[in-house]
Amino acid sequence: MVFTISRKSMSQKLSLLLLVFGLLWGLMLLHYIFQRPRHQSSVKLREQILDLSKKYVKALAEENKNTMDVENGASMAGYADLRRTIAVLLDDILQRLVKLENKVDYIVVNGSAASTTSGTSGNPVPLTTNKRVKASGSIR
């Protein structure tokens, strides 16, 4: 009889512990869902990068117009070099974004393939193809 009473008490303690653990887990999940930052899509990020670079180049051009003398052609050569450098940097940034997108797509496909119950899928194919915007052509 004493053994059944202690078993019931242990069962109640265990259920209370599981209830508290579930409640804490649910609260942490809600906190993560509502507090995590919202990520912008890569298309919007690309557009922002290109727009900001165009504004930067225009601002440099205006600054060079204001400070450039008629005989000073060296500043225009520097401007062209700067513009090429920015184009190369933007192209590198966009290539890295595309690689990151492909990795994320691959992980998403693998995750969804692992969660399916059919198990008939062999090698998953990424959802998107490698579509790359050529940044250097649009800036020059």
Curated annotation (Swiss-Prot):
It is found in: Secreted. This is Coiled-coil domain-containing protein 126. The keyword Secreted applies. Coiled coil: none annotated. One of its GO terms (cellular component) is extracellular region. It comes from the Eukaryota. Glycans are attached at residue 110. Keywords: Glycoprotein, Secreted, Signal. The keyword Glycoprotein applies. Residues 1-26 form the signal peptide. Residues 114-140 are annotated as: Disordered. It comes from Bos taurus.
